[in-house]
Amino acid sequence: MVKVGILGAAGYTGGELIRLLINHPEAEIVFANSESNTGNLVAEVHEGLYGETDLKFTAEMPFDQVDVIFFCFGHGKSEAFLKEHNVPENVKIIDLAQDFRLAPETVVATQQPTPAAHDFVYGLPEINESKIAVAQHVANPGCFATCIQLGLLPAAKMGLINSDVSVNAITGSTGAGQKPGATTHFSWRNNNMSIYKAFNHQHVPEIRQSLKQTQGYLDAAIDFIPYRGDFARGIFATEVVKADKPIEEIVAGYKEFYKDAKFTHYVDKAIDLKQVVNTNKCLVHVDKYGDKLLITSCIDNLLKGAVGQAVQNMNIMFGLDQTAGLRLKPSAF
């Protein structure tokens, strides 16, 4: 049984992680840390867990009693936490923030505010499963980055990312976190839509890093426009790139790339969000219009885009079945 500690357990990702782990056949939550909710029942904060657990939030962090710690902090807090606390070397870490996602060479090239030296493995199982399996520390990918990469990686494997890539993706309100803000209130978000961080989203360096790893080079720009949607969960992305291969060859390449993937699947028909919301799946579909390859990909931003993928990484790190605790039904209808 894998003994688990959770830091930052009161937010959306913390609550979703608890939901998964209390039903995980090979994991046990030892502590769920939240200074602001110390002593409160988890179900009083994450009300969807009424009747599911008697776990209480604690301010304590008994590192010596756990095998792995999940960091569910806001961005920038994980690095500071590790500088201030002595986490035993034998305890594995899975960080859901962006602090350690970029390799040192990527940090230098992009001048990102990320530590220049670290041993965190980028936790995208579709390309890094063998590295994750022996890793002590894993940096969980971003939600947009996961969805977009999984759409583009097979194309990169075929050497098709040679021209600028146009990406549009829309995300649910939970992607902004639990803390209320001007663009997360129901009265603003409902029946509304807007763009933000156009061409400057923090996940683009992650995407470029993985495409370069897969293709061997990357000279093309990733022109990414993110959208805020008026729904709670999910990301739906379109990626457009020029491609000179016939569609039959491209489809075959996508199916080959994901033939052994546990959660990412190529689908012959058009895809939609309800097929993936509440699951750890990513679905991918391609069409071709002249020399334009249109790729669509979709995920649940809190699951495959966050804690579902984190649990998948935990399973890999401890030699468990990747699907343990993650056999989830989509909202679908």
Where in the sequence are the language-model features?
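N-terminal Rossmann-like NAD(P) cofactor-binding subdomain of oxidoreductases
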Residues: V2-N191, Y196-A198, Y217, H285-Y289, ...
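Short, surface-exposed acidic/glycine-rich loop or hinge patches that mediate macromolecular interfaces
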Residues: G11, H75-G76, G142, H201, ...
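C-terminal active-site/capping subdomain that shapes the small-molecule cofactor and substrate pocket
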Residues: A237-F333
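A short coil-to-beta-strand element that immediately follows conserved catalytic motifs
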Residues: I29, N162-V167, D219-I222, F263-V267, ...
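Short Gly/Pro-enriched turn/cap motifs at secondary-structure boundaries
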Residues: I195-F199, Y227, D272-V276
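Predominant activation on well-ordered alpha-helical scaffold segments within soluble catalytic domains
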Residues: I18, Q149-A156, V204-R208, K255, ...
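C-terminal substrate-binding/catalytic lobe of Rossmann-fold NAD(P)-dependent dehydrogenases
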Residues: N200-Y266
